[in-house]
């Protein structure tokens, strides 16, 4: 759940994914709340599994190396792979650190491939693991930036947090 304390009336935005099904609650959008499907579901799966880099080969196939590039004055190694249902993703790793600094994924839609980009930064050590504390999520018509204040590893999390948002559950 993502709150917006500086925007009264915006309410919280919720994105959840339980490993099979995903949901979106965005209060100021036309749809408001809905179960994600198609390439949007593929994107939710990819976003979740990239939190655990060891799972990259399970979610992306046909991995290939692309020519190096520079992002924000950082030299990057670039890897691209295919996801499910003709989606694909391009991953940008900073050469000097090996850290993922950008992920672009492309999902199919009736009007063609739609890009989504996530930029990762402000990496800090969390129990011996470098974790991004800032990420910017950009898509065709919008952008959200998130700054985390704390990350805790291996703590119990209520399984309901990964399921259908409460407000959707109540509307059944």
Language model features: what each stretch is:
Residues 8, 72-168:
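Gly/Pro-enriched, hydrophobic low-complexity segments
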Residues 13, 16-17, 20, 61, 65, 75-77, 93, 125, ...:
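Generic beta-strand structural signal
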Residues 26, 67, 152:
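Residues at the C-termini of beta-strands that transition into short coil/loop
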Residues 171-172:
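Short, solvent-exposed mixed-charge patches
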Residues 42-80, 99-105:
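Short, conserved active-site entrance elements at the starts or edges of catalytic domains
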Residues 1-46:
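An acidic-aromatic
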